[in-house]
């Protein structure tokens, strides 16, 4: 997805393993078992080890996944339904690896950071419309149906870091009922929403 300032790159691949556990050793063990079974017929492209940061915050300090659908209705947004019988119960997974310029981010005041995200940093309250810029992440990165109703996805983002390479980032993982929903979100972020606003978080 190529935009006027940034491009959301596409890395081809055939299989994605998303491994989560309370103990890192369990994640390693599962990944190792998978590798033992598939190493003769596959070529690994990338492996990212995320971690839980405090109370579910991204590495830039804001609570992540706030706008996920409630658990009792999550399947409605995240799982393919009767409209596609061949893939019913599956999900369209999007992954994006974002590297943050932490020096640039830390140079912003908390108030400036909040305007980038669209929420308060410490209590996770959404900014009021009279304060929140139209370029805020939680404004631009939304998808809507033909009637203008917001369509949600299930986010499972994780922060990651590699200090030796000065890499600090967010590994975006989104599960959606329809391919078009997450794509629309990314198009808004990188190419602009209906009003042409780009996601300032990408800066």
For the regions a language model picked out, list residue spans one by one.
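Long, histidine/aromatic-enriched segments associated with O2/redox biology
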Residues: 1-203
